[in-house]
């Protein structure tokens, strides 16, 4: 149990310190929105392994979250390709290239699907997402850190 709690603290820290773009004094919400979408699909049983496919359902959930949390955003447009690719700068997210090994900096959905099989999150993080209290803790961290507007 101690290791599980240690891991939850680690991922709460990582989630509250994401490397995000900034423009006009605002933090880009894309990475938090993507992580929230992943958590929703894990909870719904639509993602059942640490492999995060760039599925139509993930795209739809991301877009729904973008509209829900930031409906009037002016400086950022919800493009899941940006965070899906740039999440590789986070220590818990890896892009898995296709067999040709070509790994270009591509952020279009079609380009990502062409060059990458999937993204993979840490197994420890995936396990944490199955625990309701832990998942809520991580969701709260993302919302309060990046998406809560006064």
Task: Outline where the language-model segments fall.
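Intrinsically disordered, charged low-complexity linkers and terminal tails
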Residues: 1-150
């Amino acid at each position: 149990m101690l290791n599980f709690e240690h891991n939850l603290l680690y991922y709460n820290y990582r989630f509250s310190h994401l490397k995000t773009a900034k423009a006009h004094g605002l933090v880009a919400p894309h990475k938090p929105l993507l992580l929230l979408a992943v958590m929703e699909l894990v909870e719904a049983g639509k993602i059942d392994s640490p492999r995060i496919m760039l599925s139509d359902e993930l795209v739809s959930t991301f877009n729904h979250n973008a509209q829900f949390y930031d409906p009037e955003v002016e400086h950022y447009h919800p493009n899941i390709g940006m965070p899906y690719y740039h999440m590789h700068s986070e220590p818990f997210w890896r892009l898995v290239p296709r067999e040709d090994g070509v790994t270009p900096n591509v952020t279009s959905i079609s380009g990502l699907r062409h060059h990458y099989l999937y993204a993979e999150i840490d197994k420890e993080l995936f396990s944490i997402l199955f625990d309701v209290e832990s998942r809520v803790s991580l969701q709260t961290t993302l919302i309060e850190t990046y998406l809560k507007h006064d």
